[in-house]
A protein has these predicted regions:
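N-terminal leader/signal peptides at the extreme start of proteins
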Residues: 1-10
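Alpha-helical hydrophobic helix detector
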Residues: 18-33
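N-terminal Rossmann-like NAD(P) cofactor-binding subdomain of oxidoreductases
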Residues: 36
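Membrane-proximal amphipathic alpha-helices
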Residues: 40-51
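Alpha-helix exit/C-cap motif
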Residues: 56-74
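Extended amphipathic alpha-helical segments with heptad-repeat/coiled-coil character used for oligomerization
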Residues: 73-84
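Intrinsically disordered, low-complexity regions enriched in Pro/Ser/Thr/Gly and acidic residues
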Residues: 82-230
Length: 230
């Protein structure tokens, strides 16, 4: 009986322990990296999703503009005093009317999105590049109020209700030359620097976000996606 009890209480043999250790080692080498990449994959996914949302918003504004102004022959008749840009007919998105199109004293409204004869989204504000960020913020659901987060310092703005850090990457305050970058808050710290985001940036280990440069009259907006640093 003592022998049977002893056999029933016996543990793993040395060979069995070695086999278990080897199996755990294989799992650590093959499976662990896949789990570690989940955050990176998630960041890359949301970045691509935001880029798609921006493209869709720009295309929507362009389509509505073409339907509104496409056959009216209004090019060159009006100048908006806020932006100072020549040869553009401007009205508030979804609020276009004859009064908007005939008044040369028409003023832009903060926080609104406007249509132009070029068909690309623009802001009616007169404070330059930093404020034109509102044009895109107003079209996206990022937990950012377009009338509140209008200027972004060198460290970017990280609204508490948003999952994004937003940078003003404009080199000057010319309304024709404004740009911004959106970086996920969950991205690696190495990616949270606006110097890595421009129209000339190459996607690299330090980039994880979306770069947007506003339209310049007939030119379409520039939208670039960076995911290698996510």
């Amino acid at each position: 009986m003592n022998n049977n009890r002893t056999n029933g209480q016996s543990g793993f043999t040395l060979i069995e322990l070695i086999v278990v250790i080897v199996i755990l080692g294989i799992l650590a080498v093959t499976a662990a990296p896949k789990f570690m990449n989940l955050t990176s994959d998630a960041n890359a996914s949301v970045v691509k999703g935001l880029a798609g949302a921006i493209r869709s918003s720009v295309q929507l504004v362009h389509a509505k503009t073409m339907l509104t102004f496409g056959n009216k022959g209004l090019n060159g008749q009006y100048k908006n005093q806020d932006t100072g840009i020549e040869n553009q007919v401007i009205c508030v998105l979804d609020e276009c009317n004859n009064e908007d199109l005939t008044s040369k004293q028409w003023k832009g409204k903060p926080g609104f999105i406007y249509l132009t004869i070029w068909g690309y989204p623009y802001s009616g504000m007169d404070m330059g590049a930093a404020l034109n960020v509102n044009t895109i913020l107003g079209m996206l659901d990022l937990g950012v109020r377009s009338d509140e987060y209008s200027q972004f310092d060198g460290n970017g703005s990280a609204p508490p209700d948003s999952d994004w850090i937003i940078f003003n990457t404009s080199e000057n305050k010319n309304p024709k030359d404004y740009s911004m970058a959106f970086v996920p808050k969950s991205a690696p710290s190495s990616a949270k620097d606006k110097k890595y985001y421009s129209s000339d940036t190459v996607d690299n280990k330090n980039t994880c976000g979306v770069y947007y440069r506003g339209s310049n009259e007939k030119q379409t907006p520039v939208i670039r996606v960076f995911v290698k640093g996510c």
